[in-house]
A protein has these predicted regions:
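A structural signal for short hydrophobic beta-strand segments in well-ordered beta-sheet cores
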Residues: 25, 162-165, 213, 224
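Structural beta-sheet core signal
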Residues: 3-5, 51, 124, 149-152, ...
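N-terminal glycine-rich phosphate-binding loop and ensuing alpha1 helix
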Residues: 1-66, 97
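Well-ordered alpha-helical segments embedded in enzymatic catalytic cores
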Residues: 36, 109-112, 212
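Catalytic-core segments of class I nucleotidyltransferases/pyrophosphorylases
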Residues: 121-123, 130, 135-143, 155-158, ...
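Conserved beta-loop-beta/alpha segment of the NTase-like Rossmann-fold superfamily
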Residues: 60-166
């Protein structure tokens, strides 16, 4: 099953960093967040990726075209241009890098990948969020309901600690960053049948999270896989610092691979 990765947005909330490189290429522990997401899928045996490029897509193309230069030590013979790779850090991945337009919206980018998917089910997620989700269990769940789409949902942590205050304004308890308001939100990590493409009808201007998803839900074609454990997007510099802190302290829950 192919995995589509949305990697073309402008990342405006991280403009301090995305003025230089696209958001999926921002580092966690010296590796792009996109690499971390792909490692999760690969751990469960899914190694055929289609990366949907847009803003600064060249940086992503260059990374994979020169993967060994980024991941390994090399010796280059300048007399003939030959290169010897040391401590080979190869991956069992097949990576298609698909230019989907600078200003295309999410639905438009997905629609442009239709010819690469054909009539088979596929997976889809955003290139800016990591999770310890069990992809194998997600796919099994999708096969149980027979509908067009499974969307993973999560309950994000609150941004701030919460106070439990009695009637006299006495603080009885402090909870450090509890779950938010209890709502389940779209966490990406979709499994889709090909009929999902039929719901994307507005070309490059189609926002996948608006009419396509709304109409799929209206037609009772969407089930959700509730993920109760770790999920975190990289939306702000604060998120980036937190993810790096987790990685550098060997406490990264999404590191399911060995």
């Amino acid at each position: 099953m192919k995995v589509l990765l949305l990697a073309g947005g402008f990342g405006t909330r991280l403009s301090e960093e995305t003025d230089i490189k696209p958001k999926p290429m921002l580092d966690i522990g010296g590796k792009p967040i996109l690499w971390h997401i792909m490692k999760t899928y690969s751990h469960y045996g899914f190694n055929d990726f289609v990366i949907l490029l847009g803003y600064k897509g060249y940086y992503i193309k260059e990374y994979f075209a020169n993967y060994f230069l980024h991941q390994s030590d090399v010796t280059i013979d300048m007399s003939d241009g030959s290169m010897e790779i040391h401590n080979n850090s190869s991956e069992p991945w097949k990576v298609t890098l698909l230019d989907t337009g600078l200003d295309s919206m999410t639905g438009g980018r997905i629609k442009r990948a239709q010819d690469f998917i054909g009539d088979k089910p596929f997976m889809l997620t955003y290139g800016d969020g990591v999770s310890d989700i069990n992809i194998e269990e997600l796919v099994k769940f999708h096969k149980t309901h027979g509908k067009a789409m499974t969307m993973t949902s999560a309950q994000p942590d609150g941004r701030f600690g919460a106070l439990n205050i009695d009637d006299n304004n006495k603080v009885k308890e402090f909870k450090e960053k509890p779950k938010g308001d209890g709502s389940w939100i779209n966490a990406g990590y979709f499994v889709c049948e090909p009929k999902v493409f039929d719901y994307i009808v507005d070309g490059d201007s189609s926002v996948f999270e608006q009419e396509p998803l709304m109409n799929l839900a209206r037609d009772s074609e969407v089930y959700t896989y509730k993920h109760h454990d770790f999920w975190m997007p990289m939306d702000t510099l604060r998120d980036k610092h937190k993810l790096n802190e987790l990685w550098n302290s060997d406490k990264a829950p999404w590191r399911v691979w060995s």
